[in-house]
Each structure stands twice: as structure tokens, then as C-alpha cells.
Amino acid sequence: MKALILVGGYGTRLRPLTLSVPKPLVDFCNKPILLHQVEALVKAGVTHVILAVSYMSDMLEKEMKEQEKRLGIRISMSHEKEPLGTAGPLALARELLTENSEPFFVLNSDVICDFPFEDMVRFHKHHGKEGTIVVTKVEEPSKYGVVIYEAESGRIQRFVEKPQVFVSNKINSGLYIFSPAVLDRIQLRPTSIEKEIFPVMAQEGQLFALELQGFWMDIGQPKDFLTGMCMYLQSVRHKHPERLHVGPGFTGNVLVDPTAKIGQNCSIGPNVTIGPGVTVEDGVRIKRCSIMKGSRLHSHSWLQSSIVGWSSSVGQWVRMENVTVLGEDVIVNDELYLNGANVLPHKCISESVPEPRIIM
């Protein structure tokens, strides 16, 4: 089977991390976001992954060449010369997608969840129509486009964009499976699959919904990235508890790379990921944070709800909170307070940031 992953966006909502690498290569729980998706696809029997690329495509290509060998699959690049929206990339990759008559997966690149790829194949073959959308239940449907469908069959009747009164709490999760016939509906031009293609398919009875069991998060911006991390760690707790770190000073779900060094008298967790080559000095407190590869947290620093980008350094007695994000190679001097700071790569911070703002 094949899968197309839409990785062409600029990832502006996840800056400053995406100023160093394209969003699909940002480390989420110690592994690039894209790799979480690709590994789940391979497990479900996908042998050919196509990446619809534009921004920083060289970096993606280099990383995925290595993964191609490791996973023993074929990975192709489909290069967009101009932004083609969410449907145009399907038309661009048409030749690759129609090498056989099998259905194929399409994924948005920001989605992290309990990927239900095997269930999708079964359900899609069962109803035999052109398309299947995975839907997920949300608390606040008024922020999204919701999907209205028959509970018994899953046949989608219509879509309602950001409803002000309650009509449904199921939204499009950004995971699809299509039969090749769907490509006859899509032209090679900028097109929105959600607004231009899906409503017509639904009218013709060609689109079905499968409800996701398990967690789901669009991790395209820092606060959702951290929420998604908490959900993912809870899922690891259920499925692979042996991967979580336990011991004195550790609380709740904590993922620590074996190459990281942790000092004495630290308090780490709940909901923390510590990447490869990270050094955490004595007396550090970390809660609900992602600490990326090669970073150093100096003694007695206190971090909550923050993301520390690759190779950054946080000084002694620093306090960071409220979705503070450090880009790559940032230095925070000793005894400073960062509240909701968004710090661009290669900066040195020498004074406190008491109110949320971008440091350029």
C-alpha cells in the first residue's frame, strides 16, 4: 500500500523550532513528528510513502533517505513549485498513487494520535466507496469544521464550519484513505480538499466517517505540542510502560533518552521528555516540558510548560514557564525569569522576559 503525507507547509505556528528544521522533522517525544507517522504506516503494511514537499525539502530528503534504508520501504518526494493546498498535491502525485488500483492513505503532517491504519483499510473496503475520513471527538466543536454522518453506516451527510449552535462534536482528524477514483475529481491547481472536494463527495454518497478510538492532537503550535506530548506519554504508559523512566526524583510519565545525563536531587515530571545528549545538572525541577537533543539545564533551574530547542543552555536558578519556547542554540543567562517567551535561534538572553513576547 501507499501513503501520501502533506509536508509542504512553512510551519509558521511552530516557530521558532521550524526556523531550524521543517515541521515534520521537529522532535516530538524524542523522534521527528514525521517518523511517528511513517513507522505507524509501515506497521500497517505500507511499502511506499510519498512526501508532498516544498519548504526545506533538501533536509527532509536527506533524513528520509536514511529512514528508507532503515525501514526497508520506498520513500518518494513530490515537489510543489507553488502551494497547492490540501488537494492539489494528490493531483501532482497522481502517477505514483496510481501505480496500482489499491486504496492509499493521505495524512496531514501535524497529526499525532493512536493511528488506526488497519481499521481504516477494513472499514474502507467494507463500504466500498471512494473515501474514508477519520473523525475524532472534541470538547469545543465551535473552533472547528464538524462532520455530520449517519451513526450506523458512517455515511457523511454534510460538513458545518465552526458551528455556533451544537450540531456535532466530531471533527475531521486529517487522516484519510481513498480509492484511486478520487483523483478524477482533483485538478492540478491550488485546491482545498476539505472545502471543495469533500462536500461534493458527501452529496454523492461517496464519503464515509470512521470514529477514532484513542487520543488525537494537532500539534502544529507550541501549547498543543505540549498537550499532545502529555497524551502521547499516557498512551506509552498503557502500551509500553517499560519505555518510561522511573526512579528517585521522577514522577508520572517521563521519557528519557539513554544518552542523557541527570544530576542529583532533581525533580522531574510529570509529563517530561528529555532527548539525546541532554545534561540536567543538580537540583533542577522540570514539569510538562520537552527538552531537545544536546541541551543543558544548569543547576537549580525551574521549568514548567516549556520547550527547550536543540543545543540550548538554560542558566542556574532560571525560571521558565507559560509555554516558553527556546529555538535552537539559545543561551539563557543565570537567574532570569522567562514567562511565555518565544526566543529565536542563536540568541543570548541577558534580561528577564516578564510578559509573553517574541525575542528576535
UniProtKB/Swiss-Prot annotation:
Known role: Catalyzes the formation of GDP-mannose, an essential precursor of glycan moieties of glycoproteins and glycolipids.
Domain of life, source organism: Eukaryota
Signal sequence annotation: none
Keyword Flavoprotein appears in the UniProt entry: no
Keyword Transport: no
EC number(s) reported in the record: 2.7.7.13
Pathway entry: Nucleotide-sugar biosynthesis; GDP-alpha-D-mannose biosynthesis; GDP-alpha-D-mannose from alpha-D-mannose 1-phosphate (GTP route): step 1/1
UniProt GO cellular component terms: cytoplasm
PANTHER family xref list: SUGAR-1-PHOSPHATE GUANYL TRANSFERASE
Coiled-coil region: none
Pfam families in the record: GMPPB_C, NTP_transferase
Organism: Xenopus laevis
Similarity field: Belongs to the transferase hexapeptide repeat family.
Listed GO biological process terms: GDP-mannose biosynthetic process; protein glycosylation
One Gene Ontology term of the molecular function aspect: GTP binding
Record's keyword terms, sorted: GTP-binding, Nucleotide-binding, Nucleotidyltransferase, Transferase
Gene: gmppb-b
Catalyses which reaction(s): alpha-D-mannose 1-phosphate + GTP + H(+) = GDP-alpha-D-mannose + diphosphate
The protein, known as: Mannose-1-phosphate guanyltransferase beta-B
